[in-house]
């Protein structure tokens, strides 16, 4: 079976829209896209991510750590119930800054002066 691709679109400086599952097959392109961003805050729009596996979860933690080491923040938006359940079971939802929508995240960071 051919793995489903993960499409990553750069919507704006620091804003990446993801479409497709975040799985073992897609970890490298995902991490590369996050590391290429030079904005003070990297916002990952998860609206199009139906699920993730343990490798995808690990890559999110790695991306968050990479951003923190570089003095940047990472936020997630549009996380569906299935993905949120994985976050809750593994308790990683506590380490991610999350917003219901991309608009909410952009507004929060614009008001804080860090978008």
Residue ranges and their predicted role:
Residues 9, 77, 99:
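General small-molecule cofactor/ligand-binding pocket signal
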Residues 2-32:
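STAS-typified acidic loop motif
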Residues 22-96:
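Amphipathic alpha-helical interaction surfaces in cytosolic regulatory modules
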Residues 7, 35-36, 101:
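Serine/threonine-rich low-complexity intrinsically disordered regions
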Residues 11, 47, 103:
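Conserved catalytic submotifs in the C-terminal HATPase_c
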Residues 98-115:
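A charged, well-structured terminal subsegment
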């Amino acid at each position: 079976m051919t793995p489903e691709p993960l499409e990553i679109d750069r919507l704006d400086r620091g804003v990446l829209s993801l479409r497709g599952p975040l799985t073992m097959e897609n970890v490298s392109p995902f991490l590369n896209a996050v590391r290429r961003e030079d904005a003070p805050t990297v916002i990952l729009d998860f609206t199009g991510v139906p699920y993730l596996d343990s490798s995808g979860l690990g890559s999110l933690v790695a991306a968050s750590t990479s951003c923190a080491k570089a003095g940047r923040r990472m936020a997630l938006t549009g996380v569906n119930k299935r993905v949120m359940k994985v976050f809750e079971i593994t308790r990683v939802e506590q380490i991610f800054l999350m917003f219901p929508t991309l608009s909410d995240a952009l507004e929060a960071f614009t008001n804080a002066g860090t978008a």
